Amino acid sequence: MEGSWSYKLLYVFLCIVLGILYGIANPILLAQGLGFIFPITSSNGRAVDSIYSLIYPTNLNVFIRLTIVSVTVFVAYALIFVFNVAQNYVGIKLYQQTCATLRWKAYLKMQSMSTSFFDTQNNGDLMSRLTNDMYNIDNLFTQAGGQAIQSLFNILTTSVLIFLLSPVIALISLSILATLITFSFAFLKKSKTSYSQVQNNLGDMSGYIEEVLTNHKVVHVLKLQEIMIKDFDQYNKSMIKPTVRGNTYSIFLFSWFGFISNITYLVSISIATAFSVNSIPSFGISVINYSFMLSYIASLRQITLALDQIFTLWNLVQLGVVSAERVFKVLDLNVEKDTATIDKLPDIKGNIRFENVAFGYNKDKPTLTGINFSVKHGDVVAIVGPTGAGKSTIINLLMKFYKPFEGKIYMDNFEISDVTKKAWREKISIVLQDSFLFSGTIKENIRLGRQDATDDEIIAACKTANAHDFIMRLPKGYDTYISNKADYLSVGERQLLTIARAVIRNAPVLLLDEATSSVDVHSEKLIQESIGRLMKNKTSFIISHRLSIIRDATLIMVINDGKVLEMGNHDQLMKQNGFYARLKQSSVR
């Protein structure tokens, strides 16, 4: 692929060069053609040679000479057209491949980041980097990239040409341009700062919109629309000032450059006229006539047009550069390396052991301290405790979302730090409180649990999860298209689908985090039945406030303030009349 890109880039560059060379030749061919059609004589009466007269006889009639010049200039224009189309066609394909690769690498980097990274990031801003910022980079490549390269090369080659025409006048003209353009750099820097602020504010606003739309039902229930509208108004208004400032700088630069061009033309024509009137040689030509003036002004126009194109595209360039910086910040993120050496676990039973485990989302404030327990294959462990006690943190550690500060976690005799994340998680199924469904058919969603699952296995898993009956009532059965926003599925039905996904995975360790909350009585019964089947021959960890689920656990682990206070089955803990008993009594009241 890289070799193919190299050839395409070379092809684009050659087309740009050839197009520019023919573009430079055009004003010369036209000016020299006028000298060929209407012969020019010097002050001593001698005819001034034209490049056409070196090829064609000078005694041709005017109509033939006009035809020769017209055809020559037309061919040059046609070649410019061909080379421009060719370089744009191949260039656009190349630029799109580059943008697609850049977007893919940024997405891959995000997917490689640890859970702790997303805990501290604005998801909307990350989405903005992959969408809005990549759109700006795409514009930079497709609209500004090739044109900027072409314009810069045009400036370089045409500058050489006008030096050949008249070094003195060229030096004066280019000095004026360079001096006035240098003055522009201060504004270019200020406009980049403004556009950088625009993109950052846009990322913040995208994050806010994503948050509000995701929780739109909560917004309506709590009647927060007016508050959300006011907050959005603040985000929206934060875009105005930097956008206006950045565009004002750009408009000023564009107008300023028009002024620069006019001043340069005026000075160049004045000097050339003075040289001509006073018969002063110009270190390259012995006589200055209207043919020279036409060639020189047309060539100078090539330079100013190229600069004009660069300034016109400057908004796109600034936005593209700022967006590229934001995307490359993602690409430069340090991925936490998985130093584990075991990338494949054998068939295991699912014995789990915690040895003096300590962890905290903030190192200065531990969430868990001194956690010790051991469970065997087939055990059902209910983790109970008040809100914020650390129940879900144990699940997060078991899923290897985070590393413990101290202690060790074992699955059978394999220590968690020795096993890669992929290999460790292959042995675990999880059903969360928030049942997330991906866009696709029901069959595709279930197959996410195990990619090689057959249709028959999917149907069997859904029957185990009590999901088959309601699936068959849907318009297209297992081929019904759903998404995470599928409101025609009840909360209970969505949860049954996630349970079916866990069934098809058939991992030896099962994690259930409030899997039966927020459902009606009928759905709860179906979910409990399906969970009961799912837990057979598995080591299961359950977080739930449902007494009916907790009391059937073989082991209940009571956690408070990040510590294990009590362990035992329901009857044992109730007899102790300790924290668990008080917790249950308060929940009944």
Curated annotation (Swiss-Prot):
Name of the protein in its database record: Putative ABC transporter ATP-binding protein MG015
Primary site of residence: membrane
Subcellular location, record wording: Cell membrane
Chain ranges of the ABC transporter domain: 352-586
Signal peptide location: none
Annotated membrane topology: Multi-pass membrane protein
Stored PANTHER family: ATP-BINDING CASSETTE SUB-FAMILY B (PTHR24221), ATP-BINDING CASSETTE SUB-FAMILY B MEMBER 6 (PTHR24221:SF654)
Residues engaged in binding ATP: 385-392
